[in-house]
Amino acid sequence: TGRSPIALPHFEGVEFDAFMTFNGSYCFTEDADIFSNPIPTEDVHMIIQNATALGRPLTVATKNRLASNGKDEDLIEYYSFAKQEIDVADDFEQVANEKVYQLMTGSSLAEHPALMKDVSHARITFWWNRAVDIIPTDGGKGRGIEKMLEYYHFDKSQAMAFGDGNNDIEMLKSVGHGVAMA
């Protein structure tokens, strides 16, 4: 999922052995981290600077926290898809210096180049045309799946994934049985 560990949905009667969150950047079990791939702090700060220049508030996401420096219509609606509300945090700058696994902001396709200007180790992924998730360049759902398969000693041919958006394509390619849902 692109969600944070604190925003995972609960399914009555279903227990999961492991979780792949932040579009594959943080994978874990109840007892152990499987894969931890935060965005370099200098890139986090550059993205914040670029978003500010565009007049776009954003959210930084750590393992335990989602902290925003403001909100706009696009970010509010993006959060609503996960039935969440934005936390405009007084300590945003402090949280931005922690291990940030993902940033979220409203953004049109035309804004993507300016948002990522001078950013070396992060990239955009998105499934909606009005907001983006920003993840490590060497991350993504495909990389998260690879790390999960390694951890459990499974071959790609033994894995199945379901996806419903553009940000799921690499995940579907990283398993033996990828199912694209409409």
What are these regions (language model features)?
Residues T1-G2, D164:
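Active-site glycine-centered loops adjacent to acidic/histidine catalytic or metal-binding residues
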Residues G2-D74:
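Active-site phosphate-binding/coordination module
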Residues R3-S4, G24, S107-E111, A182:
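Short, polar loop motifs at secondary-structure junctions
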Residues H10, E170-S174:
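Well-formed, non-transmembrane alpha-helical positions, independent of function
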Residues V14-E15, N23, D118-H121, S174-V175:
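Short, structured coil segments at secondary-structure junctions
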Residues F19, G178-A180:
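Short, well-ordered beta-strand core segments
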Residues M46, N50, L54-M171:
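Conserved acidic, metal-coordinating active-site core of Asp-based
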Residues P57, H177-G178:
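Residue-level detector of anion-binding/catalytic polar loops
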